[in-house]
């Protein structure tokens, strides 16, 4: 379970990026984090794993975020960044996925088992000996997810996971995420994706929680979404078919 209480993030110039956010994410829940650019989504994500300094409290599976618990927090909560190139930097995908387990001190046999298990789970065994430089956006996304899953986190945090994906790769990602048992926090502008993968959504506005409720209610609420600076699914679909 993830517990966030009175979380505030301020940048050196005095800008408040996250303003006194309190929310919980239940075990196994897939929560969509929705908001316009600058609403605080990325700042919230980074503060949850100690990348950005913050005031308030973050607790993941009973471990409270602090200087002495950073390693534990980052093992419990794995972040899949918006740009998969940030997580794929070694000669082969095998090495990228093995990087975390090796740093945990696992022996090579255990590392090999974890890597091959994650490759199999995501259906990317054929990428084992490939370099990220030769992969498509969808292949990179799956490989980046495998690097996180190899650490066996209980919580997955994904920042704009459908970025760089073509429709087929996007559908594959949806199917994979729906099949995983992990607790998930998914920051996204892709509202139809959020509606399919997440039953609950939190809408941010100016760094604060503007709305929290069932995804299929919030994302279709034209007035609420407009007030948050986002185009609702209804408006989005209407514009597609507008003559």
Predicted segments with their positions:
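Conserved ABC transporter NBD signature motif
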Residues: 56-65, 73
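Conserved ABC ATPase "signature" region
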Residues: 109-127
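Conserved ABC ATPase signature
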Residues: 131-135, 139
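H-loop/switch region of ABC-family ATPase nucleotide-binding domains
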Residues: 188-189
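A short, surface-exposed alpha-helical micro-motif characterized by mixed small hydrophobic
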Residues: 194-196
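Conserved ABC ATPase "signature" C-loop
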Residues: 206-207
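ABC ATPase nucleotide-binding domains
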Residues: 216, 220-243
